[in-house]
From Swiss-Prot:
This is Bifunctional purine biosynthesis protein PurH. InterPro entries: AICAR_Tfase_dup_dom_sf, Cytidine_deaminase-like, MGS-like_dom, MGS-like_dom_sf, PurH-like. The gene is purH. One of its GO terms (molecular function) is phosphoribosylaminoimidazolecarboxamide formyltransferase activity. Pathway: Purine metabolism; IMP biosynthesis via de novo pathway; 5-formamido-1-(5-phospho-D-ribosyl)imidazole-4-carboxamide from 5-amino-1-(5-phospho-D-ribosyl)imidazole-4-carboxamide (10-formyl THF route): step 1/1; Purine metabolism; IMP biosynthesis via de novo pathway; IMP from 5-formamido-1-(5-phospho-D-ribosyl)imidazole-4-carboxamide: step 1/1.
Amino acid sequence: MIKRALISVSDKRGLVDFAKELDKLGVEILSTGGTAKTLRDSGIKVIDVSQYTGFPEIMDGRVKTLHPLIHGGILARRDNKEDIEAMERLGIKPIDMVVVNLYPFESVAKKHLSQILQPSDLNLQAFLEEAIENIDIGGPTLLRASAKNYKDVIVIVDPDDYSSIIEDIKKGSVSIEKKFELAKKVFSHTARYDALIADYFEKISPSGFKKDWTLPLKMTRTLRYGENPHQKAALYALNESPSLIDADVLQGKEMSFNNYLDTHSAVLLATEFSEPVCVIVKHNNPCGVAIGENIHTAYKKAFECDPVSAFGGIIAFNRVVDKETASEIINTFYEVIVAPDFDKDALEVFETKKNLRLLRFPSLSDKIQPSGFDLKRILGGFIVQEWDKVDNEFSQAKVVTKRQPTDEEWKALKFAWKVCKHIKSNAVVYAKEDRTVGLGIGQTSRVFSAKIGAMHALSSLKGTVVASDGFFPFRDNIDVLAQNGVTSIIQPGGSVRDQEVIDAANQYNIAMVFTGIRHFRH
């Protein structure tokens, strides 16, 4: 039977109705600060914790519930003779229910971090002071104590659990199985809360790879399935900005596991460019990329790169989608269109394709710099690395052949190099002016990628340029490229046979640039 409950919450959703039900059941309610005021204003009888303990709130509310009368009443084991004797001797009464949710540190941290990523002269100390005042101490202590003693204490951290708990109490009792599930939820919640704090401190003062690292993940929803229908899946969010998870889904079916993977890849590639760009992705690799004077021309060029592979793909734009572009897009089946926004006329066009997912992601109009680290799951752990981003990348580039690239070739080389970074290794990109024309993707041999990229081309490769994400180990790659009419190459260099490769390029009068930077992607 529930005789006494302690309630102290920041999130007051459903609070009053829940407390009224407890009041009707004759439960004595202890509370603090703003929660107590909310309950009293609603006509609910409340005892202040300070009155209950005989000790006032101190230090601007930093110390409110940290008292033996509170924690003894929570932690006492009802079936332990020594605990019961201690309660009787010290005048400690049992607390049977604890309802607590925590100061809104997460929202404060997210607000700060979204600003820290932009200006460089912000007052971090002012941010830190505000964040520190939103670090809850008493709340997690109450929750952890209650969850530890879940057999005797009902602990509620989620307002969504209020109604089911009331129903169970009215039926007679809350089962031990349900109490255990509530305790599990608490420990996950408090662990994430501490992880959010550690993550925030690290981001405002980075120290590289940490010895101990807990990711503050929160499930936003379950997904229909994973990569395949037999795999269960869910979507988890980090407290980061920008976040693809926060993108507005304007229409269409729910995003799938594969949709998110492909959209992520498309977004990262699209934000490499300041010019209007269209990126079409299929199975986590681009199949067409182009820049243009506007996104309509960019889309037409990107689509022409590989119309067959584009079917069922994902499109990313870094400009607002207009009616003209939308009218062109609906002629082909796509899974997702992601853009900074869609104008009203474009949305009306897309209404004819009800299942097509439209994602509004305003950050796409900017150069996105992913925060934190890039993680990849392996058996037993993670491998962690910095994101693949290099400032002033072309400042290290040098021409290693007799012939210099022309201005037009330089432009195409830089375009192809940006695309190549986002293709599975071994990657070879054939490009002409401002578009891809052939993509050699994910082959175990670089010369195979060179051959497959040429096979995919739907137009003549004469006068094209090529980008390779890794060095050419043998001259056979240059022979293949020359046979297909390539006039200029950009690659990292670094092979023991670099001179052999350079000599081959000179033989064919091909201009070649070494960047000194590799862009493998696995």
